[in-house]
Amino acid sequence: MSILKIQAREIFDSRGNPTIEVDLYTKKGLFRAAVPSGASTGIYEALELRDNDKTRFLGKGVSKAVEHVNKTIAPALVNKNVSVVEQEKIDKLMIEMDGSENKSKFGANAILGVSLAVCKAGAAEKDIPLYRHIADLAGNKEVILPVPAFNVINGGSHAGNKLAMQEFMILPIGAECFKEAMRIGAEVYHNLKNVIKEKYGKDATNVGDEGGFAPNILENKEALELLKTAISKAGYADKIVIGMDVAASEFYRDGKYDLDFKSPDDRSRYITPDQLADLYKGFVKNYPVVSIEDPFDQDDWPAWKKFTAESGIQVVGDDLTVTNPKRIAKAVQEKSCNCLLLKVNQIGSVTESLQACKLAQSNGWGVMVSHRSGETEDTFIADLVVGLCTGQIKTGAPCRSERLAKYNQLLRIEEELGSKARFAGRNFRNPRVN
């Protein structure tokens, strides 16, 4: 069925910054999608078009991207009479119209908004749930509920504390189903709140952009200790593992790393990639850390390769790979990591996101679907992770509605699947499909 009308507008993300929302109409009704936005962005990401008009939203408006949808993309798609089930055809058309390497003409945010709305409309056109439509587009017969990675302690560019490393996550891999994983996550979260309150005072339990706590600690090991204590207090030591997102590009300085980068600069405290790798190995040895994302800078290829070969854990590429098939192909060739972080707005279309996922999976990598720190109430990625069978998702702490929107949608999907629901559990790195 063809597209009758497309209307884009400026709305607000969870940080109070403008972002783009797209309404797409077919005879089946209205399909709405909103685009997220990141704080710690990789330099190789597709371009998020901002107005840079300092008199309006401090330069962060997206009225140009909105205009590109309303004045250029919308008329083209309506006139072309393409069917909303033809996801790849529509995405290709928009990418060709943009004509740039990184979607800088229209903005990845403009193209993605339309792409997401098309995908939702395509599912309705086929009278199937969105996750099933995504599974069809990806060629998957099965669907799998993911293990949630709850970001419960925030540091780095997501928090106003001294902590260098950006995210400390709990993964309830020992749960029997997604619903139980949510309960475990929530219970540990509340235990953690009490542990932090007792140790650092009530104001230390204020939450960061993704709903995690941001106590003013400097030592990354201290964050792991807090998690260990909360997990054991909740009684889930046998059911939970820990994941980290270091976001090391944020504190990479002239070939070295500054673990106190939020303090005045002092070169004498910089450490080498090898010293940083040793620190990680200590974490893995002393805590149940099974996954580390962005352990090194996005261009520090030798450090990535060495650590992935030596560590034996899941090493996740985010800034390194930016959901871009070309960067992923290079990382596969270099053996730089073994898991892709999939963020739809890094590449800017549903079709390319699916291609990135398939490329990673076909090379034996794991894939973790991810939100951004600036989120909306849109729940697309919940259906995406189920349809792509990646087995793992990170979309914040069990706190803040823009995070819970995704987790709650996953609860609904699990309920809808009933006895057919499969939960990735301990196989989260490679949930066997078919």
From Swiss-Prot:
It is an enzyme of class 4 (lyase). Its cofactor is Mg(2+). GO terms for biological process: glycolytic process. Keywords: Cytoplasm, Glycolysis, Lyase, Magnesium, Metal-binding. Mg(2+) 1 binds at S40. Mg(2+) 2 binds at D245, E293, D318. This is Alpha-enolase. It comes from Python regius (Ball python).
